Amino acid sequence: MNRRGLILAYLVADWLSAAASWTLLFVYRKVMFEQSTWSDWPSCFDDQRYSLGLAIIPVFWWGMHALAGMYLKPLKRHRILEIGQVTWTTLLGVMVLFFALLLDDAIVSYKQYYASLSVLLVGHWTFTLFGRLVITTRTVKKIHSGEWSFPTLVIGGNERAVKTIEEINGLRKHPGYAFKGFIQANGADTSLDQFMPNLGKVDRLEAVIQSHEIEEVIIA
């Protein structure tokens, strides 16, 4: 899967998560606060407020995640990063939605506010984290197996650079580097010739990065 395909997968997962959490909240409020029964939940889909929220809220979450940089480097994401970013964006986003959409609702007691806030918070965090972890875990496995990688350039070609590359190649889990070649740091270090192409000297750095679409640079 290319970078755009991976971003699209995250966008779809985030939309589904936002729609699911909004649906959960709407059904919960209908049943618990409006004297409906659980068997009446399909009637929620006929409510214009539900449809309006379904159109707006997923877009709001896309914006939150975009501002947090959660679509920028899809191949560099990992599970700890997902947990951290999903947690703080959920806390902030739910508070915004609470004050924008729920605070003016007619209620019997403030417990209803707390209940609605809890349902939205837990629901959105759970759905979003689950969807993202599925994608991220699959991506990490693909990278560690060597199936997916990102173009990498090495700056330096001396014995220290050779040792660095040998250490990287000896890792049990593939780090995702696809070495396209190396740039000579001082114009004379060519020890890396045995591992990868010599792409020239430092004055060609910018041209090499562009022509080989380099995403990672290792200074060795």
Task: Report the location of each language-model feature.
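Signature of alpha-helical transmembrane segments in polytopic membrane proteins
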Residues: 1-148, 215
